[in-house]
Amino acid sequence: MYTVTKSFGLNGLSGFAVEVEADVSGGLPAFSIVGLPDSAVRESADRVRAAIRNLGFKFPDRRITVNLAPADVRKTGPVYDLPLLLALLTASGQLEEIPSDAAFLGELALDGTLRPVSGVLPMALAAAESGIRALYVPAENAAEAAEACGDGMTVYPARTAREVVDALRGIAPIAPAAVIPFDPEDAWAQVPDFADVMGQSLARRAMVIAAAGGHNVLLIGAPGTGKSMLAKRLPGILPPLTREEAVETTKIYSIAGQLPQGRGLVSARPFRSPHHSASSAALAGGGAQFRPGECSLANCGVLFLDELPEFSRESLEVLRQPLEDGQITVSRAAGSATYPSRFQLVAAMNPCKCGYYGHPTRQCTCSPSAVRQYRSRVSGPLLDRIDLCVEMDPIAFDELHTAAPSESSAELRKQVLAARAIQAKRYAAPGFEGIHCNAQLTAGQVRRICRMTPAAERLLRASYDALGLSARAHDRILRVARTVADLSGKQLLDEDALLEALQYRAQEKVEV
């Protein structure tokens, strides 16, 4: 007997429909799975056989052929266990025909318990778009799958395959999954507060500008000057995630298997801090099975690279595509996958190998050539993509004990949100599709948006000639100055905005 059960698979960040076709016929007992299955899918034959018997059903000891259509797309993971079990029960006459508008996802334990699987949200979204009315998933995946509810689709969470069978028979209906309320502003309370940071007024100001305009930042300073402390607090002053950003970020974490069980949409902007020993594959993603890397896991959030020169040159070069295009493509012999990687880069480095070059009280043990060699590990093309660079000096005793209290994250966030509101209104006009903040402006858009006072234009001309600026550096300065002006509520860029933008140039601060 022949039967079909519907399921879904993953291709990059998108789900696609899979038909699990099962045919039980006469002949010597055999169990074959075709349709480009990987090893996890092929192993499902043993899991399904044990689960059927342990649930009290009879395994059909006949010739079984299972096809996963479309047969030209590779199928990965244990997500097809549940639909395969149901297809065999139907094909062997132990279960009535399954509705054509129902789909099933889930891994099976040997006793028939359903285990959670990765990538449920993108598969659930694909199910809703393809007209599925009932989606059965493991209970631990119900919260994320429920985010795809709409257009008539209902998500049913189950803990065992027996529950699914009983629901299909009408014996014991399953209660639909509830959608968890999405409140991104609650996430701010989980981020450390800027009020804890004493001193470092220039670096704090740079972080506000970075948050307001979406700019990348490089912090240079000796150990203990607060570089990591500032970076970890940046998500607390960034705007809240929009629902579209939250869905995209949740899809990435779901595919990577890093979404906490029982969790709906990701509500906090990600903060990723990979160790400097991370390989290029760890940053870009990939592997035997396509998985997002750190660049994609930081999507819509912050990627913090501490000890920047200690990363391998190969790893740092990986950053160029996502910084330029906002996405990263991973290619392997089995195919390719593209993941969004629109992160804000915050990098930190010591001024030299020992960390004390230029320190007011500690002696640097590095030779001038060693300092140059250390700093040259950060390539020029990468520096070209960093808008703000700050040198952080050690904090004096008086700053720690007598300085006025620092502004809190809530106060700084008000400034950032006001500047972002100005940008949102500005870039709602035709011709700015896909632009959300100043850092995303193209060269042509910079000339349209960054209009200056006559005095500011004279200052920029003089600086361009005196400093030998490139065209890219010229545009980068204008983008930062535009953000400074937005924070001040000014329409034209004045001398103050340009002077502040000029002091954050990275090239001279890294070169010795």
PLM region descriptions:
Residues D111, L305-S312, G355:
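Catalytic P-loop NTPase motifs of RecA-like helicase/translocase cores
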Residues C300, D306-E307, V318:
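Walker B catalytic acidic pair
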Residues V34, A40-A45, P60, N67-G77, ...:
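Basic, amphipathic alpha-helical bundle interface domains used for macromolecular binding and assembly
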Residues E244, K251-L283:
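Clamp-loader machinery-focused feature within the broader ASCE/P-loop NTPase space
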